[in-house]
Amino acid sequence: MSLYHAHKGKRIPIDQLKWGEEMEYQLGVSICDPDGKSSRMKMSNRGPELIKEFNTNPVAAASKIVLMPEFGGWMIEAVPTEPYMSQIDPEILLSCEKQISLRRKVLTEFLKPYNHFITTMPNAPALGT
């Protein structure tokens, strides 16, 4: 609120306004039983380790994705490397969903060798307050 009150009433050129989006994923691991006939899923706390590995991987730079830690070791946040610009351009607005899908695909492929997966869960905006 203090940021809002500090800037309310000021004219800010539209080209200085930027916006973005983020996706928060829960990190899971698939554990196979020794007999190899069944598996179970558990939440993984390897988030910080996998985030560091991903962000130093050339795939991350090429796909313009940055991962950051979220609430616990089992949550990660994926954001674009740069914010969207402020122009109300339909192409930019329509690219948002495509970028979210691309991030999920890249991250899913990255996690396969680690036997990990990601899930998302829609939440009410005020859930964390």
Regions found by a protein language model. Name each.
Residues 1-129:
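Terminal catalytic/cofactor-binding subdomain
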